[in-house]
Every structure is written in structure tokens, then in C-alpha cells.
Amino acid sequence: MTRRLLWMVVCCLPFISGCKQSECAISENAIDDTIYQNLPFDMPKVQQPVFPAYEVNISKFGAKGDGMTLNTKAINDAIKEVNQRGGGKVIIPEGTWLTGPIELLSNVNLYTERNALVLFTGDFEAYPIIPTSFEGLDTRRCQSPISARDAENIAITGYGIFDGNGDCWRPVKKEKLTASQWNKLVKSGGVLDAQERIWYPTAGSLKGAMACKDFNVPEGINTDEEWNEIRAWLRPVLLSFVKSKKVLLEGVTFKNSPSWCLHPLSCEDITVNNIQVINPWYSQNGDALDLESCKNALIINSVFDAGDDAICIKSGKDENGRRRGEPCQNVIVK
């Protein structure tokens, strides 16, 4: 019996020695290297993030999954703690977690357990107006519910749902609804344009729309006060990752985004694996994924049910795009 047990342990060693106790790749859905075979272009394997074993639960930072408590500080404090400790996992357990913007930092895996719903607040004031890029142009928008900038080795994984509360933000065109749906929406509040064909959630949202000649980017808005007046029009993308490397989105669901859902910009080594994106059929600018000026990306095993484009591959627009000069390259969609 002792000899047989020893033989079993020795046989198992080759399988466990490839992953250090202190750090390990976290993908639960292994990527078959055959995906790189017979490509019409040369492409390196997309690098996957690896994280230390350290982990924290947001509940220990005071977060409450009751759907009423605003957990912005608790979630971001947990992320900062893991980042400062050298990396690991931030666990969002079962519950409904109301929050404002979440900023992901390097070496952090934001992991959602089953029956975890991360619901972003519909309070526009919770989202600061920041310089960004939208529709390929430099502009200002509200900070995204989920964001990262100049980060490396980051992930959002697990089984949970991220709900952008987009109905609070989006205008709705009459032609996209039935008569009863339209009447119900109008009675709920908000304002209509002069032709009564588009519903806006606030007067500020309508004012922002009127300031746009094209591409949803306002013109002639100069002071901070003027920008604040149209805050409701500055709908953020649900997830904005900028200039980040080794990015993984896996297993989770993103839904009901205020504008585009997922927008990696100038990122490298991106894996989108086994996720769902769900936006209503009437969602204005409700793209699922806009991959912009990115290099080395896998978009695999995922479902995109969007109110607009499912997948867009782009590299900026007009003078702004030419000045950036970053093509989108080495992308596999399967």
C-alpha cells in the first residue's frame, strides 16, 4: 500500500510542478494552440496573465451585497490592496453589489462568484468627466464603470454579471419600439426632441445631442460648467482599457451598457474567452466589442447579442487616428 501511494504521488508531480504555489495562470478554459495554425499572417501566441495566489473578498472591506449600499470605495480599496501586495484575486461573492466606477490595477484578477451581480449606479454625478477617445476621436466622456489605464496583467473572470444600468443613460429612437413601449417610455419622464422621434433621459442629454454634428462628439463645449451641463449625454463605454497589456476577460457576462460595451484601446495581448455581452435591441450605440488600435488578440467562444455592431475592429478616425498611427493587428475571432 505504501509503495502504491508513493507511485501515485510521483506520477502526479509532473502535472503540478508546472504551476508554482505562489502564482498560477488562471484560465479555466484552456486555449488550444491549434488556433494559431494555418493563419494567413504571422502572429505570436497571445500572452496570458498570471497572478499570485493572494486573494481578498470585498466583504472584508465593508462591501454589502444588498443592492442598496454603494460599494465603490470598498471594491476599489480591495483592488488597491491586492495591487500593493504584488497582485492576486479580488473576489466578488454572491449578491447584488451596487457601485460606481471600478478602476482595475496591474496584477489584479477581479473574480465574480456565481450569482454575483455588479450593478453600476444610475447617478450621473458618480462618473467624473475625463479626457478620452470615443468614436475614434479625442473628446471628453464620463468615466467608464470599469476602466484600466497603463495596466499589465489584469483580468475579469468568474461567473458573475456586470450591469451597466444603460437605460438610465441612453436615448431611444421611436422607430425601435412598439407604440405601447414608446408611450410607456415617454410617460416615465425625460424629454423629446423637436420632432418627437427621439427620447432623452434628461434635458442635458438632449442639449449634448444638439451640440454634436457627427459621431456623438460635442462641439463648441469649452468650459467645465458647459461640459457638466451635458453630463448625461456623455455616456461612457461600460469597459475601457487603455494602453494595457496581458488582458483577460473570461466567463462573465456584461450587459446593458450606456454606450459601447467593451472598448480596449491601444492594448496588447488581449484574450476574450467564453463571455457574454447582452444589450437591448433598442440600445443606441450598443456595440458589444470595439477593438481599437490593439495588437495580438483572441476573441473566442463568446456570445455577442448587441443592439448595434457585434464586433468592430478599428484604428481611430480622421486626423486623430492618423496622429495615433496604431493599426489593429494580429486578431483571431473564432
Please provide the spans of the model-predicted regions.
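Extracellular "leader-to-stem" segments immediately downstream of a signal peptide or signal-anchor
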Residues: 2-7, 11-13, 17-91, 96-243, ...
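Right-handed parallel beta-helix
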Residues: 114-115, 152-160, 245-255, 268-280, ...
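Alpha-helix N-cap/helix-initiation motif
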Residues: 67-71, 288, 322
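Conserved residues at the C-terminal ends of beta-strands
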Residues: 93, 265, 314
